[in-house]
């Protein structure tokens, strides 16, 4: 069962000035802001269930995008941090989220990892799609 903690926590964090947010929240805010400028709408942030947490859940044109955000001190590539165990947890959490939001079950699902360098002067986020996740 999911929690509403994610939605209210995400809204709360978005109101905190970026420099006062913890590093992980800063990275999520950067990715969320970037995607929202591209027309994606944020549905949930830090949504959790017994299987795990979804950092960002967004939608645009009947597409659902789930983003796992990884902060890094540099742009050293980090999608390998999403190992097979983490992928299984992520897939189960996505299934739980979709079960709680049945109106979106027929939307095209995309899952991505965003590697975000902190501080922002280190560059823009890098993206990697995760295929065959769920």
From Swiss-Prot:
One Pfam family in the UniProt entry: UPF0102
InterPro entries per UniProt: Restrct_endonuc-II-like, tRNA_endonuc-like_dom_sf, UPF0102_YraN-like
Cystine pairings recorded for this chain: none
GO molecular function annotation: nucleic acid binding
Domain of life where this protein originates: Bacteria
Entry similarity comment: Belongs to the UPF0102 family.
NCBIfam families: PRK14689.1
Entries under HAMAP family matching the protein: UPF0102
UniProt protein name: UPF0102 protein SYNW1051
Organism taxonomic ancestry: Bacteria, Bacillati, Cyanobacteriota, Cyanophyceae, Synechococcales
């Amino acid at each position: 069962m999911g929690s509403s903690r994610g939605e209210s926590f995400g809204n709360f964090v978005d109101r905190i000035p970026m420099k006062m947010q913890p590093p992980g929240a800063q990275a999520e805010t950067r990715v969320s802001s970037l995607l929202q400028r591209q027309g994606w709408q944020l549905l949930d942030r830090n949504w959790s269930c017994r299987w795990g947490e979804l950092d960002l859940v967004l939608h645009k044109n009947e597409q659902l995008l789930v983003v796992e955000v990884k902060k890094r001190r540099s742009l050293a590539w980090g999608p390998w941090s999403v190992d097979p165990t983490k992928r299984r947890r992520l897939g189960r959490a996505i299934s739980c989220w979709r079960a709680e939001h049945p109106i979106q079950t027929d939307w095209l699902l995309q899952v991505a990892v965003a590697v975000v360098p902190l501080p922002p002067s280190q560059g823009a986020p890098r993206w990697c799609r995760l295929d065959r996740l769920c």
